[in-house]
C-alpha cells in the first residue's frame, strides 16, 4: 500500500482525474486527504464523503488546476469528452450512447458549454438551480427525442457564442419518457433567456421548434426555426423579443404565447 499526500500542492485548487472514457472529474484539494493505491485500484479519501474508487486502467492521467463552475461537453460520434470540475460537489454526469444526462444539486450557477457534432444524441439536465447553457458551435441530432431536454423549472440563460453556428434537430417520434414532458426540439420546463451574437438553427420534427413551459425572452442572437410540425416558438406564459433576429417556418403558429402574450420591443422578426 502506498499513500500519496497532496496537501503540499497549495498553489492549485483541484486535482483532475482524466479517465480513459474521455470524462475528466475534478476534486477539491481542500477535501482530499490522500490517494491510496491498492490491488490495482486507486482510492480517493475525501473529508465526510465516500471514497471514489478507480481501477488503474480507468485513469489516463492526473493534473492540477484552478476551480471552475464551467462544465465542458464536446460531442462526437466517436466519443463524448466531458470536463466536470464539480463531479464531487453535486453535479453528476452520465453518458448513454450519445445522450449526456446531468443531475445537478449544486447551489451555484453552473455554466455548461456545448461544442462538437453528434448524429444521434441529446443534452438532458435536471437542475435544482438556475444555470447557463452556452452553445459554442454545437450540432445535435436526436432520432427519438429532443436535442436539448431541460427537465428543470429553473431559469436557463442560453448564450449563443459570437461567430458560431449551432444546429438542433429532433426526431419525428420520441421514445417513451414516462411522465416527463417533452414538447419540442429545444425544450425546457423553465424560463429560457437567449443572449449572444451567434446563430441557432432549430428543426422541430415532432412538435414545436423551441418550447418553454414558462416564459421565453430573446435579448440577442440570430434564431432560425427552419421547420416545425407545430409552433415555431412556443411558451406557456409569454414570449418577449427585445433584440436579435428571429425567423420562423412552421406548420402552425410562428410564435405562440399560449396562456400569456407576445411582446416585441426590438430586434427583427
Language model feature labels by segment:
Residues 12-68:
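Compositionally biased alpha-helical segments
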Residues 6-11:
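Sec/Tat signal peptide C-region and signal peptidase I cleavage site
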Residues 1-5:
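Sec-dependent N-terminal signal peptides
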